[in-house]
Amino acid sequence: MNRLNNIILLVVFICTHAHSQQAYFVDGYHGGIYGHYPVKWKTQFIVDQLSKHPDWRICLEIEPETWDTVQIQTPGAYRQLKNVVGTKQVEFTNPTYAQPYCYNISGESIIRQFQYGIAKINKHFPGVTFTTYSVEEPCFTSCLPQILKLFGFKYAVLKCPNTCWGGYTNAYGGELVNWVGPDGTPILTVPRYACEKLEENSTWQTTAWCNEESYLNACRDAGIEHPVGMCFQDAGWKNGPWLGSGKNTKSNSVYVT
């Protein structure tokens, strides 16, 4: 009987642990008027998709000057977006003016990128706050923790699962790390996990790009209880929720910003 009880307890523990590992996913769009942002339809498409999929959450990494053109060419969609960006469905995660890679420019230039970009976004969307720095392409450099903190950011993400061809951070650590700048400033950060490998036969994509079960299992084996994947879609793509929505969301993932 004691042996049976032990087996039952073990099964309950395993089932509870498996159930407790909720998978998360960060979706969104990146691009802009000088890159890829089809002004005639994109803003209305975003608003409509958010309304159609209330469980969807997106991060916006759009060149701030884009909103000048959107306001003029599609004023109705622009007004609708203004009403949405203040909700929990949307977060601006990279307000830099031109989405620089950062590692190839000076600290002073990086500061101006944030200063000008934040001012432009606040002009169009007053009251928007900037909490988490997250990017689709590898827009990272060592001095960012200090700069981000000075602009009010609380968190950062060091993943770029779908654009590693531009560079990528080392796979390191588990669920969270403190990213420390050369001046000693730390910022709480989601890293590219040590278990987050490059996709097989790929130098431009990691396993975190679509929350496959193999990736989530690797996270579970590494002790990561709240694994997160991400993909900021090109703004030129006419695609809504990356993993599907509602009951059809891949791997039962929950969208977060």
Protein language model annotation of sequence segments:
Residues 2-10:
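Sec-dependent signal peptide recognition
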Residues 11-19:
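Hydrophobic h-region of N-terminal signal peptides that target proteins for export
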Residues 21-257:
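Catalytic-domain carbohydrate-binding cleft regions of carbohydrate-active enzymes
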